[in-house]
């Protein structure tokens, strides 16, 4: 099964995309992963630098579609805000229409 992961990529600690990718690949799944945000460290430390990657994520998904890359399951994790949430909802709705 190929799983598309959309979530934050954190520079410190094995959390979010780093953890999910590791666990799912260890269980034999193929993983396609794109960050919703790049975050310097876990948020529990009190402060973090963050880069919203919505534009990159959308361009990457368009590229993958042109290349014929497909997925069987979708995971959406960390969302940076309302604008990104709206786009991620569109992705989820399109996946649902395809039976995912």
PLM regions and their residue ranges:
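Ribokinase/PfkB-type carbohydrate-kinase core domain
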Residues: 2-14, 18-100
